[in-house]
């Protein structure tokens, strides 16, 4: 008679638990999903499942397990960036480190639409630029570079050589 438990157990490397669940968050969704890393042997398998999940976030875990890596399933053409946080809270792109390192250090995975990732980069760049501009104006004169030129209070009305003193309606 065949032992049921022997065939049901996933093949796991020594030192790792048979299940390694990691929370996956889809951008714009209020909740996360868990996936079992022990069911994946490489980045290709994991990224296929994550991209398929990104296209069908409401899919049940049983439906996701039944997926095979086929191009007609639509996951290959998905336009998602896959990111993850390690145990130290540092964010990486999926595939930046060797698979063995990833499986032992991953804490959370994020599925982000590619255009959203670019918008986030732009927003972070704008915030960095605004912070740099605020710190560059050390003396508060409105000039980021202190080149000896500063706006005086009486120069505020001066627009292209025209001042309020030249206008008779200001009497």
UniProtKB/Swiss-Prot annotation:
Residues 117-171 are annotated as: Disordered. One of its GO terms (biological process) is regulation of DNA-templated transcription. Gene3D superfamilies: Phosphatidylinositol 3-kinase Catalytic Subunit, Chain A, domain 1 (3.10.20.90). GO terms for cellular component: nucleus. Residues 19-114 form the PB1 domain. Residues 162-171 have a biased composition (Polar residues). It is found in: Nucleus. Residues 142-153 have a biased composition (Low complexity). Its main location: nucleus. The keyword Acyltransferase does not apply. Transmembrane segments: none annotated. Belongs to the Aux/IAA family. Aux/IAA proteins are short-lived transcriptional factors that function as repressors of early auxin response genes at low auxin concentrations. Homodimers and heterodimers. Lacks the EAR-like motif (domain I) which is conserved in the Aux/IAA family. This is Putative auxin-responsive protein IAA29. It comes from Oryza sativa subsp. japonica (Rice).
